[in-house]
């Protein structure tokens, strides 16, 4: 069984536990399970996650309707618009249409969700995101001048956000230790990322720890102000 299948089945177990417990109190008009995806559902990873979830959910006896919303996030310069896209999606699912559960796939959708001033009191499961994140910039900010602040998702759990799922956790210090162990003559280490939300979030994580790593600071390349 692939790691993805283990992940899907674990998430499904949580979903069914939550949904069935809600049915004890819900009416016949229980709301849907809402999946919010950063990307077009036709992309390979997104398709695999959603398809396997749907198969396992039905196989496990799930009967609640599942609704998929796509934010269609593309390049980083669009980041100031993502907050509004997420707000528009959440506004569609209120009152009698309130979801029993929200599943968020992708870092852009996740960043858009935690950037909301108001978050519905609904359990959230997430996938395809990392433990380190950055809040989205204001709509009037030039993204090229953006200096994002690192945040740890654990902070939101500590504040009472009903959150579960799998997170990617990057141990920069351990990676540096491994590099120096395998290549002891190494004098300089550079982090090179693409100019995406994930790349910028990784840069922010590394900058947060710069000066704490044994040896020289890392050179960071990838985000250029224009």
What are these regions (language model features)?
Residues 10-21:
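Bacterial N-terminal signal peptides
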Residues 3-5, 24-226:
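Short hydrophobic alpha-helices and adjacent helix-cap/hinge residues
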